[in-house]
Amino acid sequence: MKHHLCSVLFTVAFFTAFAAGSQCAPPDARAWKAGVASVVITPEKALWMAGYASRNKPAEGKETDLHAKALALEDAQGTRLVVVTLDLIGVPRALRKNLEKRCGEAYKLPPEGLLLNASHTHSGPEFRVDRAPWDDGNLKPTRDGEAYGELLEGRLFQLIGEALDKLSPAKLGYSHARAGFAMNRRLPTPKGYQNSPNPDGPVDQSVPVLRVEGEDGKLRAVVFGYACHNTSLALYKWNADYAGYAQEFVQAEHPGTVALFMMGCGGDQNPYPRKTVEMAQQHGRALANAVETALSVAPREVNGPLRSAYGEVDLDYDV
């Protein structure tokens, strides 16, 4: 039976040139502005949690706060891009569309100028209404999820505006490292694939890092990525998982800096070992160490102009 997974959203932002030295690009290609902001998005109510079908009750408090963070970039021609990272399972289409409309009207930000990236933590709230759990026919979980989604939209709208308001001259640099805790989770067996560690399967353990420095040379923001499920935990408490701990460690090492985590293509990769807070912290420390390694080497200067693209596609699949 053929189905369509409609409106898969993607935003692609890329820089047209990486230069090893400033002499490789004209001065206006290096005339960046950047602004960064952060806000707590931890639910205040005991909402149901997203990610694991076996859960049978709402969250029972928090282990860590959940955050949304925004990095606004502007090149010499005035082209803007706002990167928003979220400690959430994903980004519902309705949330994306509502923010597009509001940011377009208030901030003159086009759809291709807004990049939303969720860490895919399985210890965050379930606010996707079409996936909300049912409690013996009681619609309260759905209504609570809708209310959280409305609150979240408002906070993200303000967050984006704050990052844009903080735009000031900046310098961008790229470097990378590796972290080894992600492992392929598709284990072939005589009966088909099962969700288990597969050390022989394909894996992406790269850690790309974008550093943002002010005119004074001080580090203002660090954007780093990793392709791995945020599934170190399966508790009934809010937790940003290894990605959240990694951001905390980086920010502690660089006071005044905002660290942003971007999830890569980690659908077939899990963190191993897992199941405890200590393991999530261990993976977070490993990822933070990789970021520090990348920051310790001379970066490639990132030059403009800035280009981005946005589109929606239909994906055919059979079941």
Ranges and model annotations:
Residues 1-4:
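N-terminal secretory signal peptides that target proteins for export/translocation
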Residues 18-26:
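Sec/Tat signal peptide C-region and signal peptidase I cleavage site
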Residues 6-19:
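Bacterial N-terminal signal peptides
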